[in-house]
């Protein structure tokens, strides 16, 4: 919590006056503190705790022994089945979330072997999207593998985060459904570089970081050239807070014009947030 105060100020001083936080439960409180003038930082739209399936990317008990881990459920953001999905969304709303994040596939930095497999059924995601809509919230989906992305897009999520291994079918679905793509090239570059350092990541994480990280820039090129809607995002916390602007350089290096990159962080990002009038 104390570090989040420092990170908020660094982000604001880096020139970012509004941010979307995907998966840090402490940041619903940080948001309130900023709004009350107690803390210096950007305007925050927070997803609260990211939702996961058991053993999924955002399961808070990954890597723990069963005796210590217990059996987390919707209150802890872990869902199995449609009823759990509904309850978990309502819990995040109760906790102060502005939107919902799901981890539709495995991830790079979680203590789990697979970083690509789908981790929700389409029915579960449909219920999450439907329930979020009841509370005037939308859903963002962390996803690396193509199948998990396709399920999430068909179910109606508003954005795909990372999208590392998206294929041509995924791109066409995104265009059909109007799904936003948030590439987070910064995170890919960061983990790919750190994966070269012996011992920097746990043994189960290092191969994922080395494989998935370097691919994000090429995925961005493919999506951009195909006309997918792209919104700026960094996954800061993986890369360093306050260095958000590096993403502009990566996007431009991958083929986007400077003005398009700025547009992705302003107009397009505001549309993704539903704040284009503000």
Describe the role of every protein-language-model region:
Residues 154-159, 175-180, 199-202, 227-229, ...:
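Glycine-enriched alpha-helix->loop->beta-strand junction motifs that scaffold or abut catalytic
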Residues 30-33, 57-58, 149-155, 248:
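Distinct, well-ordered alpha-helical segments
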Residues 15-21, 138-141, 158-161, 233:
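Short catalytic-loop micro-motif centered on adjacent basic/acidic residues
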Residues 1-137, 170-172, 177-198:
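Divalent-metal coordination cores built from histidine and acidic residues
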Residues 88, 147-148, 169-170, 219:
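Short acidic active-site motifs
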Residues 134-138, 203-204, 212-278:
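His/Asp/Glu-enriched, well-ordered alpha-helical/loop segment
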Residues 150-170, 250-261:
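Structural recognition of alpha->loop->beta junctions
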Residues 49, 143, 234-236:
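Active-site metal-binding loops of divalent metal-dependent hydrolases
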């Amino acid at each position: 919590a104390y570090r989040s105060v420092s990170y908020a100020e660094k982000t604001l001083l880096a020139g970012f006056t509004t941010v979307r936080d995907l998966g840090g439960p402490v940041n619903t409180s940080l948001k309130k503190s900023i709004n009350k003038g107690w803390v210096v930082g950007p305007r925050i739209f927070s997803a609260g705790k990211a939702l996961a399936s058991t053993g999924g990317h955002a399961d808070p008990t990954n890597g723990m022994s069963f005796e210590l881990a217990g059996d987390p459920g919707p209150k802890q953001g872990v869902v199995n089945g449609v009823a759990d999905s509904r309850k978990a969304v309502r819990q995040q709303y109760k906790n102060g979330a502005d939107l919902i994040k799901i981890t539709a596939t495995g991830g790079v930095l979680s203590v789990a072997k697979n970083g690509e497999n789908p981790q929700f059924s389409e029915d579960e995601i449909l219920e999450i999207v439907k329930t979020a809509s009841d509370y005037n919230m939308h859903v963002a989906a962390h996803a690396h593998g193509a199948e998990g992305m396709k399920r999430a897009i068909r179910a109606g999520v508003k954005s795909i985060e990372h999208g590392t291994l998206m294929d041509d079918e995924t791109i066409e679905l995104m265009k059909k459904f109007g799904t936003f793509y948030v590439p987070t090239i910064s995170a890919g570059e960061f983990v790919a570089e750190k994966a070269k350092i012996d011992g920097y990541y746990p043994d189960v994480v290092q191969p994922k970081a080395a494989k998935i990280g370097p691919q994000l820039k090429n995925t961005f090129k493919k999506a951009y050239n195909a006309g997918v809607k792209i919104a700026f995002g960094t996954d800061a916390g993986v890369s360093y807070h306050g260095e958000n602007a590096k993403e502009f350089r990566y996007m431009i290096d991958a083929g986007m014009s400077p003005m398009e990159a700025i547009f992705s962080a302003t107009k397009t990002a505001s549309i993704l947030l539903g704040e284009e009038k503000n």
